[in-house]
Every structure is written in structure tokens, then in C-alpha cells.
Amino acid sequence: MKTCRPREATLPEYWISIPVSSVVAGIETPFAGAGGGVIHYSDLHTEGEPTRVITAGFPDLGDGSISERCQKLQHNFSDLCSGIVREPRGHEAMVAALLLKPADPRCDHGVIFFNNVGPLGMCGHGTMGVVRALKDLGKLKSDRVTLETPAGIVEATIEDDGRIAVLNVESYCYRLDVEIELSPGELVTGDI
């Protein structure tokens, strides 16, 4: 195991532009669930929120969209995913980001996020961690990057000072004018 030190970070000026500290070196850890291989990852922190970016060694999820590969991950490798983010090498608040080749030609990289419960459609602080890891690994073509996620295409930029801004997928309305009874005779209406 290699000892890692985080880089210095400063407080953000804007809520969408946050500095991300990254480890100087990645850590290699063997997982029996991966066929005895080694899964390579780097740990990063976005304002204290941990992200483990998996760069190599994860079992092949085959072809297809990131959403399709996310389903394969959930059905075939949920125990392995839990092992990656849980104790003793992780903890319950950790999010992992599996870097993949994108299926969508408009995207630079593909990524599937997961936590100790299962896959996530998207993760804001995880996206910032991924962008910083890609920069540190020399895998960014410019200061802008597009990521294919199960939730859709996410765009991000990284500034010279390390601040990262994310343009997330659009939110949508599942149901309009939903009535909920809080107590007998007391109704509230809202959208989901």
C-alpha cells in the first residue's frame, strides 16, 4: 500500500465551482471477487466528500451503453462493488466511479457511480472527483470533458486553479399536483 497525501485545496467562490483534492499516488488492492486480480483506484475528496475512481482491473462489462453496462454491474458484480467501497478500505459514505469507454461518440469518457447500496445514476461530487483524476492521469484533451453516465451526458470544466464546474443532466417532473394528506383534513399539493 502506498502512502498518499492530499493536495492543497481552497474554498470555492461559487457553488458550482469547487476545488477537488486528489491523492498523489493511487492505491492497488487485490479483491478476490475480481478473479484474484488487482483493481487500481485513486481516492479523492471534494470538499470532504470521498470518491474512489477505479482506473483499471475491474471485470469486463462488455459492450453497450453505459446504462446497459450499469445493469450488468448491478446483476453480476454487486458484491464486488460493495467490497470496493466498504470497510476496511472504504466506508459507508464513499462513492466509487468506474471509468469506462463511452458508447456515445459525443462523450470523452464513460462512468458508472456506485455506493455501498448499489449503482447511482449520477453523482455531483463524484463527477468532480472523476474530472480531477482524469486530469492527474493525463487523460483530458482540454479543460472541458463530457461524461456518459446512466443518467445521461454530463459536462464539466476544470480551471487552472483546480476548480471544477459541472453541468448536470436536466431534472424532470415525474408527477404533477400530487396530493398528500399530512393529518386528517390537512392536504398539501406538490410535484415529484
Locations of the language-model features?
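A glycine-rich beta-to-alpha transition motif near the start of alpha/beta enzyme domains, typified by
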Residues: W15-R175
